[in-house]
Regions:
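Acidic, surface-exposed loops and disordered segments
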Residues: 1-197
Length: 197
């Protein structure tokens, strides 16, 4: 099987990580894959903030736990030693999609490197708070940014979970011959010529 297809089919969300730190090279490769994600009109509106500082990582975990409504002490990042925050420029109309595509690329890159990852929500709520906007400024990040997601990434602790069964009935084939009748309402000279071809 093609290696890209293999990665697409085998990647899983991981919910148990080893505490071992990742190298800057590993994280750099993951982020590079994210930077090459497709973006609306080529705007490249998404950015990545790579968090390896334990104090900041734990602060984000505690805030995420509070927003999510879990009991104090629960780690929504499942022990992952590194968190990659994805934010996107609010002034770009496709910023949420751009950030989501960046996340997808990075999840696949982590898998290709033999690492585990998981998408964690609530970045929007966090970065709507003044203190987190202030944190961005501390890091030298200016502008209007919306939190898209956190990528928790690290070495997998335990077995990779089996894939969930795919739900049926999620693909519809709109094949040209079977659509002729359905598009009768729109038939004009151009459509008639198309049908005759």
């Amino acid at each position: 099987m093609n290696e890209v297809m293999k990665a697409l089919l085998e990647r899983r969300s991981i919910r148990k990580f080893k505490p071992d730190a990742l190298t800057k090279e590993q994280l750099g490769q993951i982020v590079e894959a994210g930077l090459y994600a497709a973006s609306g009109k080529g705007a490249q509106s998404a950015i990545a903030v790579v968090v390896t500082n334990k104090a900041l990582r734990d602060r984000l975990s505690a805030e995420n736990c509070r927003i999510g409504g879990w009991e104090e002490g629960f780690d929504p990042f499942y022990g992952a030693p590194a968190i990659i925050l994805v934010l996107a420029n609010k002034n770009e109309p496709n910023h949420v999609y751009d950030g989501s595509l960046m996340m997808g690329n990075m999840m696949l890159a982590a898998h290709a490197l033999g690492l585990g990852s998981i998408w964690i929500n609530r970045a929007k709520q966090e970065f709507d708070m003044p203190e987190y906007q202030a944190l961005l400024k501390e890091l030298g990040i200016e502008g209007e940014w919306e939190g898209i997601a956190h990528l928790a990434v690290g070495y997998i602790d335990g077995e990779v979970p089996a894939p969930a069964e795919r739900k049926p009935g999620r693909v519809y084939w709109a094949e040209y011959p079977s659509l002729k009748k359905g598009f009768a309402l729109f038939q004009g000279e151009g459509f008639a010529a198309l049908c005759a071809s």
